[in-house]
Amino acid sequence: MSATSSSGDVKKFQAVPKPTSNASPPPASSGFNARTLWPDLIETPENQWVFECKDIIEKIGTNGPIAVEIKKNMEKCLMYFYTLKKKLNLFDHTYTASCILFYRYWFIYGIPTAITECIHISQGILVTACKTMENNRPIEAYIKATCEFLMQNIPSLKSRTNIDKLKWEFRDKLVTNEKKILCLFGFDLNISNPKELIEEVFSGYYRFNRDHNLPENFKKAFPKILQESRNFMVQAVTQPVSLLCDGYTFIVLSLIYCGLEYKKLVDKDFRYPKNFFKDRFPIEVTPENFANIFTDYKLLEENFFNLKSNKGAKLQIDSSMIDSVIDESGDVENEVSEISDPFNYELIKSGEVKEEFLNHIETRVKDLLDKAKQESMKRKAKDPIRTPDAKKPKI
């Protein structure tokens, strides 16, 4: 290709050079500010997601038949989260995040009366939780597991629904519902997930470096209490407790409950070390406050779902019982100002670690390596590599 210049000489077009990394972007047109519409740093909003027990219960409504139907649909949605957690091999904290987001959605917007529409919303919530908490799964995995759940748990669908048609319906609505849910939440993905927070607050580093000076008898008992606390949260999140307290309060609630159970069943002299909660959580822990939360928790169980995981009479915990396992006494005047930051940089900036922590990491790495080797050997045993047939001699 060529072009004629004004002087009549024929010159060839030269290739346009590619801009370097230092090239400045083209000037924006007047009235358009790219930084306003798409800033370098997007700050997600944070809303208040803690409500009064009275308001949570009243949200069900006073119309008996409608309230029963709503609770029935809600229970199916919670069952859906648990079933897909098993089928898709999701983490516990993804399951708890799904339940937390579901209750927030229900409290603000309510849920449809049709169960299929409820599952549509639940599927969008599950995908959002999965993307927020861990690696996402292929869209086919969500669709297949969701449709199987519907066919197994809603008998009326079996006779009048084509499974392939159902899959296409859920595929079409998945992305739409996911966008809808994000917009309705105002992109507020600050889940304050207690199952995730407890792993961070009591991670290996803090256990071996921050908590090394705890009493030996407590250090032996605490891993068992911590495990029971994890189980407590996974079970408790099926009731709308996440609307009653934030993530850190939820963790303290579980540790107090499991500490009382340990005191009753194992060691009658058990007690958390002095200011154990004050030094680790950014909240004020008092017996009176948490006794009220346990009372509200019991009311939620009575008004919502009758589940096997319900604690029932075990939630009748008063302030004197809580006071018997915690020792948060201190300077009342400075109590608020001394509330701890669980991720205080001052505790870790030196970079020094205990030898026990290094040994712990080495043991964990070896365990993971051995596990990977065993799984690899199992796969090879199930699918042995076929040896190629011997070449036949040419005739």
From Swiss-Prot:
It comes from the Eukaryota. It is found in: Nucleus. The modification Phosphoserine is found at S24. InterPro entries: Cyclin-like_sf. The keyword NAD does not apply. One of its GO terms (molecular function) is cyclin-dependent protein serine/threonine kinase regulator activity. One of its GO terms (cellular component) is cyclin-dependent protein kinase holoenzyme complex. Residues 1-31, 372-395 are annotated as: Disordered. The keyword Acyltransferase does not apply. Keywords: Cell cycle, Nucleus, Phosphoprotein, Transcription, Transcription regulation. GO terms for biological process: DNA-templated transcription; DNA-templated transcription termination; positive regulation of DNA-templated transcription, elongation; positive regulation of transcription by RNA polymerase II; sno(s)RNA transcription; transcription elongation by RNA polymerase II. Component of the BUR kinase complex involved in transcription regulation. This complex phosphorylates 'Ser-120' of the UBC2/RAD6 ubiquitin-conjugating enzyme (E2), leading to monoubiquitination of histone H2B, the localization of the PAF1 complex to the chromatin, and the silencing of telomeric-associated genes. Also required for histone H3 'Lys-4' trimethylation. May phosphorylate the 'Ser-5' of the RBP1 carboxy-terminal domain (CTD) repeats. Necessary for the recovery from pheromone-induced growth arrest in the cell cycle G1 phase. Also required for vegetative growth itself. Present with 2910 molecules/cell in log phase SD medium. Belongs to the BUR kinase complex composed of SGV1/BUR1 and BUR2. Interacts with SGV1. This is Protein BUR2. It comes from Saccharomyces cerevisiae (strain ATCC 204508 / S288c). The gene is BUR2.
